[in-house]
Amino acid sequence: MSNLPSEPEFEQAYNELASTLENSTLFEKNPEYRTALKVVSIPERVIQFRVVWEDDKNQVQVNRGYRVQFNSALGPYKGGLRFHPTVNLSVLKFLGFEQIFKNALTGLNIGGGKGGADFDPKGKSDNEIRRFCVSFMRELSKHIGADTDVPAGDINVGGREIGFLFGAYKAIQNKWEGVLTGKGGSWGGSLIRPEATGYGLVYYVAHMIQYAGQGSFQGKRVAISGSGNVAQYAALKCIELGATVVSLSDSQGSLIAEGDAYFTPEDVGKIAELKLKRQSLTAFEHGGKYKYIEGSRPWTHVKVDVALPCATQNEVSKEEAESLVASGARYIAEGSNMGCTQEAIDVFEAERKEKKDKAIWYAPGKAANAGGVAVSGLEMAQNSARISWTQEEVDEKLKDIMKNAFETGLETPKKYVEAKDGEYPSLVAGSNIAGFVKVASAMHNHGDWW
């Protein structure tokens, strides 16, 4: 890759997968899979385009738009659209690469992709966002379709933006099809879709707790980072299951519960309203229940049983990982994609090996936060059949998918990774190997490598 420009985020994601495969017996037992790794690491297609739009002052603005169609071995490309000034090809390649294996772990027939633009919706009016979405879809519509590529939302692309994008696609292509997921409930959306990533994350961790013989979420203290969609619904589900949530955060700092205080569903609802207005957590009125720590993430300020990073990539550093271990945390699962740095993962995995059943247990995002794309896949199925399932039906299917993802991550390392008696299986190794083998096998059957 030396002839290519540096892509640090993508290289981190690739190296994390490659090192897991190298440190297992997979290549020893199946040396041909080395070829598959080379092939799967290059996207099938990368689409890059300009997005020209007009602001409220009638001034021309231009942004870069992208769609990385990474792998379609298991089904149509599937992955979100992100609108954020930090969006670039490296970030989207990392997200798309992770998405391939995450989608494989759901058991649904969906491939992997990711897209977005370096557009910042903060400070923009509804009309400006609508005009941007229409211009963005003018080009994207040439490359997507219900059986080709089905984008969804991601950071700064919620129900409003999905609506604008869907309306633009319908007008341009003159057809109504399930080309986007995360749609409104009255026009093709699925119940539980907004909640799915957060709920699924908690369902996954519940299996970890149960497997470890520690009962359930009842009475557990939970630290959550972020205050967007994933963090909100993870917090609400934790509270519903009897846990105590003691932190949320945003890009400016962390809100930490003081003394015996904890977040209530009402608190989470008020924070959700602030976030809809794109306001900071500093605007949250709480009567002194919480302390806002500017410029800091929650991990070094809390003593908890469960840590759920739900904000963005690389939000748990080596030092923060060591702090969580020292304070007695037992479970960490990524609600965000690549939420932990590789150095942090190394800390957690070393503890797992050394302290066995007394260790902290780490679950990677490609398994733990697969609930969102899982329900997106269920939305695609409902659109294809022109039906809508009830909330209970979708929730039960989500629970089954998260249970299967956990069990796959649990059983796979027993075949490929040496472990001592009493040691928890490596969920990162199990998830990486299982997802990779499923995709590589399908690609081999299609003649993508030989």
Curated annotation (Swiss-Prot):
The active site is at residue 114. Keywords: NADP, Oxidoreductase. One of its GO terms (cellular component) is cytosol. One of its GO terms (molecular function) is glutamate dehydrogenase (NADP+) activity. Its EC number is 1.4.1.4. The keyword NADP applies. It is an enzyme of class 1 (oxidoreductase). It comes from the Eukaryota. It catalyses: L-glutamate + NADP(+) + H2O = 2-oxoglutarate + NH4(+) + NADPH + H(+). One of its GO terms (biological process) is glutamate biosynthetic process. InterPro entries: Aminoacid_DH-like_N_sf (IPR046346), Glu/Leu/Phe/Val/Trp_DH (IPR006095), Glu/Leu/Phe/Val/Trp_DH_C (IPR006096), Glu/Leu/Phe/Val/Trp_DH_dimer (IPR006097), Glu/Leu/Phe/Val_DH_AS (IPR033524), Glu_DH (IPR014362), Glu_Leu_Phe_Val_DH (IPR050724), NAD(P)-bd_dom_sf (IPR036291). Belongs to the Glu/Leu/Phe/Val dehydrogenases family. Homohexamer. PANTHER family: NADP-SPECIFIC GLUTAMATE DEHYDROGENASE 1-RELATED (PTHR43571:SF1). This is NADP-specific glutamate dehydrogenase. It comes from Botryotinia fuckeliana.
